[in-house]
């Protein structure tokens, strides 16, 4: 299935982002494939959905946070989490859960601290999904 692999190229990882999110990592897809009962076609379909649906949700989270609408940011973050947990529940999914908690508590400091890490992690997962589809 996924044979290509690239290194992190010496990039420093962010403290809150697991190292597996900083380079193409076939093990992310191996775990997802296991959760999907080995159905590679379904994995690719879900990857395509993630690739298409992530940008507007990320924009929605960012815009809602910037405008102080934490309820809307929470809803978009929840939808974003639903897209990523099949692929990476312990990385992206966990970061988004932490962001959702901060949004629910309206903890501005934590929201701003976590939002960048979440977005970076989700964008990296999206990039990996694009590679899977190539």
Protein language model annotation of sequence segments:
Residues 1-134:
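Two-component system phosphorelay core
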